[in-house]
Amino acid sequence: MAVWHSANGKVYLPPSTPVARVQSTDEYIQRTNIYYHAFSDRLLTVGHPYFNVYNITGDKLEVPKVSGNQHRVFRLKLPDPNRFALADMSVYNPDKERLVWACRGLEIGRGQPLGVGSTGHPYFNKVKDTENSNAYITFSKDGQNTAFSKDDRLNTSFDPKQIQMFIVGCTPCIGEHWDKAVPCAKNDQQTGLCPPIELKNTYIEDGDMADIGFGNMNFKALQDSRSDVSLDIVNETCKYPDFLKMQNDIYGDACFFYARREQCYARHFFVRGGKTGDDIPGAQIDNGTYKNQFYIPGADGQAQKTIGNAMYFPTVSGSLVSSDAQLFNRPFWLQRAQGHNNGILWANQMFITVVDNTRNTNFSISVYNQAGPLKDVADYNAEQFREYQRHVEEYEISLILQLCKVPLKAEVLAQINAMNSSLLEDWQLGFVPTPDNPIQDTYRYIDSLATRCPDKNPPKEKEDPYKGLHFWDVDLTERLSLDLDQYSLGRKFLFQAGLQHTTVNGTKAVSYKGSNRGTKRKRKN
């Protein structure tokens, strides 16, 4: 007998209300054939490779920290194209359109020779090499699960993981790192227990340390021994770009495109000193439930009677540094960005996040600290010389910018307002100034006691949305040129795109080159 049964599977229905769709900038941005070349000065920075150097009282910074393993975040400020006095006023209609910049080309120049830098710690927590052990490391006489000795730290150095990377966008790059989390109220966090950790997202600022082989973590909050990593990150937070978050950003402003090259290998294998926080499951758990599951204890009288520490870790190496695998000093062209923003520089600014430790040489500077000339020294005495370390970096940035138009249509303005309402304020849409009165009151000594108080509410300046964040500000408001063929990146752009210079109504533009080939004749037999 056939009977009706309710369906066991799920039925998926379309949403009852239409879902808002974010348009790509290519759908409403109108590109012109006017290109500009922008370039920066030679950008130099000098400092100590491992830490900040302060005066004796510690209240004045004398030498900043400049490490090859730091992020360099350049904030490029561009001029407002709507304020340009264009020779050809037919380029756009200010009543119906606004002008914006689009990035079409980029070259990040790096000076200084290639070199490998080393980092380390004079009190590094490594007990012994565990790759080629020739004797079992015994514990001290304090009992089980104690440190190998009171102090096992050694002076150790190594080269970091090799990394070359840059991220281009119109907002700061989003980074990720692991940090200490707040424990639940019901869980009593006892002293000495491992705290909970969580993944956090923050902007990558200029000077933030990159991952050098120990992970992206807040070492200041999660390593109280101050001896598990090198000096340059022991009191820092190492960040790594959150590519997954930026790739799924609905607007795609943080990352138009990026280039990345990382490499490392485990050079040495060590074991930590100190008490073991998490014991290996054995006979001490549940009356022997896990006995002989992970190890079989040693016999009495043997060094293996007391199990050793299992806190293994490697020190990585970046290996060979070669000019054959360089991401810098070469042009990159943006044809299609990974997100909805295809290179449009909203708010007339651009963020370039760079990491490059292939030029990681640290200078050693020795200074004679005694009175008298150096030629009078008879015998070498190390106490008569002071040793200093410095690290230098050299950058130069070149851009190819394209002038674009934004139509002031309702659907376009609605999306821009949802994305960033401050853009519409900068464009002064709907602002109608009141007519000036023919007579204005102007006091000469407005700050004196004889006159009235000045205005208590002066007009507020526009607040920086990234106030409190540290970037390397580069002003390009007066560094633009229409003569692309006068610059290296401009000539490369004209050549690779098959373009040539033209002049229309006094405004320089570029156009595609036409073919000069004649019609091929058919050969007679």
Swiss-Prot record:
Transmembrane segments: none annotated. The lineage of its organism: Viruses, Monodnaviria, Shotokuvirae, Cossaviricota, Papovaviricetes. GO terms for molecular function: structural molecule activity. Its main location: virion. Keywords: Capsid protein, Disulfide bond, Host nucleus, Host-virus interaction, Late protein, T=7 icosahedral capsid protein, Viral attachment to host cell, Viral penetration into host cytoplasm, Virion, Virus endocytosis by host, Virus entry into host cell. This is Major capsid protein L1. InterPro entries: Capsid_L1_Papillomavir, Capsid_L1_sf_Papillomavir, dsDNA_vir_gr_I_capsid. It comes from the Viruses. Belongs to the papillomaviridae L1 protein family. Self-assembles into homopentamers. The capsid has an icosahedral symmetry and consists of 72 capsomers, with each capsomer being a pentamer of L1. Interacts with the minor capsid protein L2; this interaction is necessary for viral genome encapsidation. Interacts with protein E2; this interaction enhances E2-dependent replication and transcription activation. The keyword Disulfide bond applies. Forms an icosahedral capsid with a T=7 symmetry and a 50 nm diameter. The capsid is composed of 72 pentamers linked to each other by disulfide bonds and associated with L2 proteins. Binds to heparan sulfate proteoglycans on cell surface of basal layer keratinocytes to provide initial virion attachment. This binding mediates a conformational change in the virus capsid that facilitates efficient infection. The virion enters the host cell via endocytosis. During virus trafficking, L1 protein dissociates from the viral DNA and the genomic DNA is released to the host nucleus. SUPFAM superfamilies: Group I dsDNA viruses (SSF88648). GO terms for biological process: endocytosis involved in viral entry into host cell; virion attachment to host cell. One of its GO terms (cellular component) is T=7 icosahedral viral capsid. Signal peptide: none annotated. The keyword Cell cycle does not apply. It comes from Human papillomavirus type 5b. It is found in: Virion; Host nucleus.
